[in-house]
Amino acid sequence: MYNDIKLEKGLYNLSGKSFTSALEELDPSAAYVGTELAALDAYERQLKRYNIRVSGTECDMVEKFFASTETAVLFPEFVSRCIKKGFDDTVLKAVTAVRTVSESSQYLGCVLDDSTAYGTTAQTVALPASTVTEGTTAVALEKIGRLINASYEAIRKQRLDVFGVMLRSIGIKLANTVVGKAVTALKADAAGVTTSSLSYSDLADLYGKFDNFNMTTVLASPAIAAKIAAMDQMKDARAKADGKMFLPFGSELVKSAAVDDATVIGLDRDFALEFITSTGLVLETDKLIDRQLDQITVSVTCGFRKVTPDAVKVLTITS
């Protein structure tokens, strides 16, 4: 049971396992089906065990994690989850079709040669072929990270939910930097249209360039997204409860500072882009456990590759 687990630093260093995965092996969630703890994962059960409240009106201070050597072991996972939540709550999920974990810093994906026309075939004629081969150009994975400086004395009396907001903001900005790499990959050799001044008809023209795929997403800079939102054709558009806005033809309008003001990217999020990582978010856990918060690094090593070039089109604004 969760009350009997011995928490120690080594749980962060098991090969191929996250801290939560290691806890789940010791305290499987399957054992709690039908109980009041069924909604909690193994890490959350440890927070309950030590009565550490990370949100709500009775939220604890950061120092609650350091009440004992065992509770201190839980602190890096709290930091990691907050940063990861910020990282995941970004436009990355709006532009990524698939996520791949690579064991190497160089990644060679597969390439589909699908250029032969589709159509009817006579009985005596060979079927047109689609060929999948290994790519010839490797994607180099690069590290993107941040150094977090904080003293224990500065944050020990800070509420965990407030500190968590700060960490999530770091995760968001880290992810937005990663999105810059995604934009570069999407734009590379992409077909599209050109206009001297952005109008709704240009967006409709971009939409019409998609034949086999759907333009599920329109990615634009904040300034261009604002211009699109102000167009007369958008006056009846309504943002959903989650803040998402859609163009009349169904494409989600997504803004990102990683896109320049001369570019609008249309894509089918289900086919366009592969997000490749060699690791998840990497955090220096030992220092956090030992209250050495003055130089904590968080990073992700990643790259992007277009899976289906036809699922991406670009509108270029020349003025």
Q: What is each stretch, according to the model?
A:
Residues 1-70:
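Intrinsically disordered, low-complexity terminal tails
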Residues 118-120, 158-159, 227-229, 306-307:
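Short helix/loop capping segments that flank catalytic or ligand/cofactor-binding pockets
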Residues 197-290, 297-300:
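Extended oligomerization regions of viral-like shell subunits
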Residues 1-30, 287-319:
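Protruding loop/beta-arch "assembly-hinge" segments enriched in small, turn-prone residues
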Residues 1-25, 133-175:
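Hydrophobic alpha-helical segments and helix pairs
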